[in-house]
Amino acid sequence: VDGTRYTVQDTQYLMSRANQAIQTLESYKKRLRKVLGTLSTLEIESHVTLGDVAATLQRMEMVRRIISEVSHYVLELGVHGRLVALQLEELRSPDMPGSEIILFDYLPNPNPRNIGDAVEALENLDDMNIVDLKVIAQVVGFEGYDLDTPLQPRGYRLLDGIQSIPHIISSRLVERFGTLQALMAATLEDLRAVEGVGGN
């Protein structure tokens, strides 16, 4: 491909590896859903720590990596990988958030550039460091922070999960109230004062 030679391995072996990877992906997705559910509860109760955020980013990255691995097997299997491709498509849940929205929720001064740098740093961690929550916290922008440091979410992720709220309105709400706790404490009049809310 493009002048590069790739060794195509035995189809039966690849199918076995692909099926194992699919099973791993299913397990990782279940774990990620549980972690996200726990994070939501902690956010609402205002009990989130940096360790909770790092653990969520870790699980998201592990899911991303196994999806990439399965995609590689599908490519190598060609026509023999159709079933695996279908299974992968089913497991690519569009409702599962990416690490970017977690970073926008928690980084001290989030902007597209440092979010991009954080995502790249997370993706570049080796297998040894991806299991170390302190390393994860450091590379995404929390160097020098303890894992038990309390954090306040801005509310991007939870708002993004409400389909009836357009992204632009979510952004305005976060900009207006600053934190999820402040948003939850807002009165109806406070909410209506935000452009695009309540027919405003």
Where are these regions (language model features)?
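Long, highly charged, low-complexity intrinsically disordered interaction regions
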Residues: L14-N19, T24-K34, T38, S68-V194, ...
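Extended assembly-interface/linker segments at domain junctions
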Residues: V1-Y6, D10
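Long, charge-rich alpha-helical interaction segments
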Residues: L36, E43-H72
